[in-house]
Amino acid sequence: MKILIAMNNRDFFKFEITEENYKSFKTDTSIYNWLKLNDYGYKANSEVYIRKGNISYYGIV
C-alpha cells in the first residue's frame, strides 16, 4: 500500500493508492501508465496531477 500526498490550492491531502480506489481516479495518460506500471505507487520527487470527480489535485511526492 502506498500513500500519495497531493496538493489542491493550499490544502494537502493523503490518499491510499490501492487497486480499488485507483480505478476511481481519472488521470492523464502519463500518470495512468506510471501508476499502473508501478503497482499504484510512486517515485520520490515525482510531479503528479490527479482529477477525482470535480476536484483536481496537484503536488510533488
Where are these regions (language model features)?
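Short, mixed-charge low-complexity intrinsically disordered segments
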Residues: 32-61
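Short cationic/low-complexity microdomains
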Residues: 18-40
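N-terminal acidic leader/helix
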Residues: 1-26
